Amino acid sequence: MKEKRALFVAGPTCSGKSALALAVAERLGGTVINADSMQIYRELRILTARPDQEEEARVPHRLYGVLPASQPGSAAWWRDQAITAMEESWQQGRLPILCGGTGLYFHALMHGFADIPDPGEEARQEARSLLAELGPESLHARLAEADPATAARLKPQDSQRIARAWEVWRGTESGLSAWQNQPPRPLPGWDFAAIRIDPPREELRQAITARLHGMLDNGALAEVEALRVQALDPSLPAMRAHGVPEFLAFLRGDISLPEAMQRAAQATIRYTKRQATWFRNRPFVKPPFLYTIDARIASFQQLSERSMADMLNFIRAFH
């Protein structure tokens, strides 16, 4: 049986992945599937530069804005959802195009995770109750007695991961670290190719600053204010998205808007460095199934005719 095919469009934040994935999907008949850990959150369209409604209407888009900010996503959850979206896209005769900069997601999709049993609702409720009653640091201390290997890897303030580790220990009678040491479940039946955008660092820095200004003009502060009134746990993934902590500090009156902008830009730039390091050190697809573009893609038309032809031929040969 012929292997199914999927394409990654990968690169650091603000490199132009979404524009490129959309253009490829339009030209080759694809479905764009989100592989960004923050674009899954419903309330974060502006701050995560999610495709707008007009772009989403041009080709099928999946897994964008599907979780509320109050619900933590995970790589394991995303993997299950992405596999379903890929299968549906392939059955419809469309090329699955996974677009994002979260290297862990790409690695998880291809290589899988250990199969951790569901700890059950009773264990989840206990973890939530203890977290509310004791706070993360005290619950972390209890976890250190029950599952020291996992506790040693967690920060005492990381309430979501501490609660998850506690519920796994209580519900499965085995520590989370022990389950994670089990052999992973790789994804069979799929072949992957990748387009990786790798722009110069200074070009990326300028684009990040410009994007932040554009986000302010488009309502980023209102987006953060809508999160603030929900009084969510600050350790939730959505509350740690680039720009959210910084603009929250501004809205509280702790810092000025220029300082919030500077901090948000610096945090994003540091993140792009970590993304680049991940892609260099853990390549998820290697030549000849990897096509690299060494410039930021502001639009598909920015590519030269030769580059466009070469890239599309690369995809067609794989697909």
UniProtKB/Swiss-Prot annotation:
One of its GO terms (biological process) is tRNA modification. This is tRNA dimethylallyltransferase. Catalyzes the transfer of a dimethylallyl group onto the adenine at position 37 in tRNAs that read codons beginning with uridine, leading to the formation of N6-(dimethylallyl)adenosine (i(6)A). It comes from Granulibacter bethesdensis (strain ATCC BAA-1260 / CGDNIH1). GO terms for molecular function: ATP binding; tRNA dimethylallyltransferase activity. It catalyses: adenosine(37) in tRNA + dimethylallyl diphosphate = N(6)-dimethylallyladenosine(37) in tRNA + diphosphate. Monomer. Gene3D superfamilies: 1.10.20.140, P-loop containing nucleotide triphosphate hydrolases. Residues 36-39, 160-164 are annotated as: Interaction with substrate tRNA. The keyword Transferase applies. ATP binds at residues 11-18. It comes from the Bacteria. It holds the Pfam family IPPT. Keywords: ATP-binding, Magnesium, Nucleotide-binding, Transferase, tRNA processing. Its cofactor is Mg(2+). Substrate binds at residues 13-18. The record marks 102, 124 as: Interaction with substrate tRNA. Disulfide bonds: none annotated. Its EC number is 2.5.1.75. SUPFAM superfamilies: P-loop containing nucleoside triphosphate hydrolases. Belongs to the IPP transferase family.
